[in-house]
């Protein structure tokens, strides 16, 4: 006689995902400054023990490539190229940095001991991990920075006034409700901010609009 095998049927339950568009508005200026291509090449050359290039670096390449760009990195490294990019392209903040600040706010404001639950309950959906900003004015600030070794170096920082950004979040609502998520984002904007120069008060923001989309 053949053997009868009992099989356990597992029911796969779908996750009830919900979505919302969040708009954050700056409470002051934001400074955006990632490692630019000029510095990156210099570091690579130093590691390869290449002779130093005595030719003066292109300041516009430094300014332009120190930003994340939504529609790809511009190739015209000139003043006109920057002006065109600011009109036709869009500088960005990163979804990674934004979500990290949310998780940090959860811990710092003692909402939870760890940020794991929040991280697992909410995602930011962004093309290429980038969130474009809108702004009213752009400035290039020149500052002397003192590295740990060597002489002070001149750096150029992109600063934006009247900025805002809209991004889409995906959440389950099982651990953190949309109201709690909104509260966390506002706490992150007030106490942490986004971008460079946050210890100097740059990059602070608040939520200006929430739109449920599913």
Where in the sequence are the language-model features?
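RNA-interacting cores
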Residues: 1-214
């Amino acid at each position: 006689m053949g053997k009868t095998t009992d099989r356990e049927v597992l029911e796969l339950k779908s996750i009830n995902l919900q979505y919302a568009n969040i708009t954050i508005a700056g409470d002051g200026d934001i400074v955006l400054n990632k490692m630019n291509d000029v510095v990156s090449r210099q570091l690579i050359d130093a590691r390869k023990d290449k002779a130093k290039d005595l030719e003066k670096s292109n300041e516009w390449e430094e300014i332009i490539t120190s930003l994340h760009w939504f529609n790809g990195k511009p190739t015209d490294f000139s003043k006109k190229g920057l002006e065109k990019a600011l009109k036709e392209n869009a500088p960005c903040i990163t979804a990674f940095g934004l979500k990290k600040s949310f998780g940090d706010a959860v811990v710092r404001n003692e909402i939870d001991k760890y940020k794991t639950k929040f991280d697992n309950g909410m995602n930011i959906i962004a093309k290429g991990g980038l969130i474009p900003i809108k702004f009213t004015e752009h400035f290039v600030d020149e500052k002397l920075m003192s590295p740990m070794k060597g002489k002070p170096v001149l750096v150029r920082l992109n600063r934006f006034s009247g900025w805002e950004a809209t991004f889409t979040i995906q959440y389950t609502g099982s651990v953190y409700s949309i109201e709690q998520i909104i509260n966390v984002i506002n706490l992150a904007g007030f106490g942490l901010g986004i971008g460079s120069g946050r210890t100097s008060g740059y990059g602070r923001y608040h939520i200006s609009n929430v739109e449920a989309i599913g």
